[in-house]
């Protein structure tokens, strides 16, 4: 894989550095990783704030409709809309609380399907806004040895990238499987987007390298930090990330993470 080969060359260059330079590189990498985590947290806060504002407006508008109209049919419809909005607010709250509860860097047996569910709750409205069709295949698999919060950060980043690469009405495919031979969890995210030119693939994991001109209309993307952060997280989990892309066809990210050993 071209991107993986570029990363191997980067690691070889780092290994040849003097001890003093190596220490400085390590410190800078740690600082960069913390900055990336704060960027992801800031985007999450912005997304959830916008979501709750939409929910509150829905509740307010239908409450006013219910108060203005006395016929049972209109009131019942208003109550149904208020109930649906409240249930969505509860799902978002649970997803955010799930992330907040796990702010540590502990790697432990984790139900990755739950992590995926929470991420999709947070992105549901955004995907709907751009009429993105999401097709998921979630197999029943053993727990994955990972840090749930960090893997959710990777998932949110890759799904947001996929959404940005797709024209209105495109498709994202998400698949979760278990490779019993390698004892690895396999997470695949594929989009029907614009694709990445082959000559840019070797650079896309470099910090601050971006194929985008800048943030999109939602304010996301364009810094070049996202994929670099994702790759470092997966590497720290002793996992692998493979990138395949074709211009005009789309891009596929395949992530392999260790399966937790049975107790």
Regions found by a protein language model. Name each.
Residues 3-6, 22, 44, 55, ...:
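Generic alpha-helical structural signal
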């Amino acid at each position: 894989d071209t991107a993986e080969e570029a990363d191997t060359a980067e690691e070889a260059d780092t290994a040849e550095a003097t001890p003093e330079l190596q220490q400085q590189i390590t410190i800078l990498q740690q600082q960069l990783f913390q900055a990336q985590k704060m960027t992801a947290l800031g985007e999450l806060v912005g997304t959830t704030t916008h979501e709750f504002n939409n929910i509150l407006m829905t509740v307010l508008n239908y409450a006013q409709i219910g108060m203005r109209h006395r016929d049972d049919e209109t009131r019942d419809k208003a109550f149904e809309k208020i109930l649906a909005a409240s249930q969505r607010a509860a799902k978002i709250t649970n997803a955010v609380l799930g992330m907040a509860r796990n702010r540590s860097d502990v790697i432990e047996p984790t139900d990755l399907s739950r992590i995926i569910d929470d991420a999709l709750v947070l992105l549901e409205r955004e995907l709907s806004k751009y009429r993105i069709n999401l097709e998921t295949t979630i197999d029943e698999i053993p727990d994955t040895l990972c840090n749930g919060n960090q893997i959710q950060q990777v998932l949110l980043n890759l799904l947001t990238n996929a959404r940005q690469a797709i024209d209105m009405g495109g498709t994202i495919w998400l698949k979760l499987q278990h490779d019993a031979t390698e004892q690895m969890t396999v997470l695949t995210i594929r989009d029907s987007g614009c694709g990445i030119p082959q000559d840019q693939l070797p650079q896309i994991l470099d910090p601050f390298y971006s194929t985008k001109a800048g943030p999109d209309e939602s304010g996301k993307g364009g810094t070049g930090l996202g994929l670099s952060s994702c790759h470092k997280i997966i590497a720290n989990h002793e996992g692998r990330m493979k990138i395949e892309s074709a211009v005009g066809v789309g891009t596929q990210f395949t992530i392999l993470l260790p399966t937790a050993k049975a107790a």
